[in-house]
């Protein structure tokens, strides 16, 4: 399944790619799509299983993670700081 993560900073996006959570593969950094606003403008597109969960961001850099669905996006994780 495809996912998109947005970040508070470019450093956070680069760090996510370098220190990817377990089960995350094929990470591509790219501009954030318009319908997913982001503070820094950089997102990470990646693959993970349908059972992928993300409950805690120890770096506090991730703004949100969404799953790409047929109807749009489903929020998997949203920062409590958002």
Feature roles, as predicted:
Residues 15, 39, 54:
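Short acidic, gly/pro-rich beta-turn/loop elements at beta-sheet edges
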Residues 10-26:
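Short amphipathic alpha-helix segments
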Residues 22, 37, 58-61:
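A generic structural signal for short, non-catalytic loop/turn and secondary-structure boundary residues
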Residues 48-82:
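C-terminal structural segments of small proteins and small subunits
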Residues 9-12, 45-51:
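Helix N-cap motif at beta-to-alpha junctions
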Residues 1, 26-47:
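Amphipathic, hydrophobic secondary-structure cores in small proteins
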């Amino acid at each position: 399944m495809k996912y998109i993560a947005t970040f508070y900073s470019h450093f956070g996006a680069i760090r996510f790619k370098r220190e990817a959570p377990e089960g995350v593969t094929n990470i591509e950094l790219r501009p954030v799509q318009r319908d997913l606003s982001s503070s820094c403008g950089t997102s990470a597109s990646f693959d993970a299983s349908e059972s992928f969960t993300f409950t805690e961001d120890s770096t506090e850099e991730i703004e949100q993670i969404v799953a790409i669905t047929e109807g749009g996006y489903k929020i998997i994780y949203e920062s409590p700081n958002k």
